[in-house]
């Protein structure tokens, strides 16, 4: 899959023609081991999600970007979902969102959050739902990304379970960001398209 063509065709068209934005700013969060780094690397077509590759924005958040790619990702570093870290992360996100909105420049806003859940884990905890709802309350729409989808049947069952809880999410996207031995990668295009739907109107 040519991610560069995929992103440039699906996203740049929306950005340039409809919104006049230069970048889509995405917050990404999730437990350790859910595949955030693989997802980020797939979006950028490069191994950027490594220690030291991002630029620190706050203690809990780092910015990952690549010249020529119309995406900026704010990665919640070390987000382990315990109450203390969750509270601190929410505080930092609120501060970041408010600072961006002060500029009154849509290009600076946080346009959405990708919240990642590992499909094979078959778990979605109350603390995750609360975190998502807190982010949505800031006016940041949330796309729930089911990662590591080696079995679409199992992922669909988990998605149904999550939807019954009615978290404040815009949509759910199933993704396998990197080819496995048996299953080719998929879902990045759909994730990009869902993200484009959340961009502000011009």
Language-model features: where?
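Short loop/turn segments at strand-loop or loop-helix junctions that form parts
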Residues: 74-79, 116-118, 173-178
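Conserved C-terminal guanine-recognition region of P-loop GTPase G domains, centered on the G4
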Residues: 91-170
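Flexible, glycine-rich phosphate/dinucleotide-binding loops
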Residues: 35, 57, 122, 151-152, ...
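Conserved NTP-binding/hydrolysis module of P-loop NTPases
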Residues: 71-97, 190-194
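Canonical P-loop GTPase G-domain recognition
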Residues: 2-10, 140-143, 148-202
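Active-site-proximal flexible loops/turns
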Residues: 48, 82-85, 125, 154-155
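Conserved phosphate-coordination/catalytic loops
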Residues: 55, 87, 126
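Conserved G1/Walker A P-loop phosphate-binding module
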Residues: 1-83
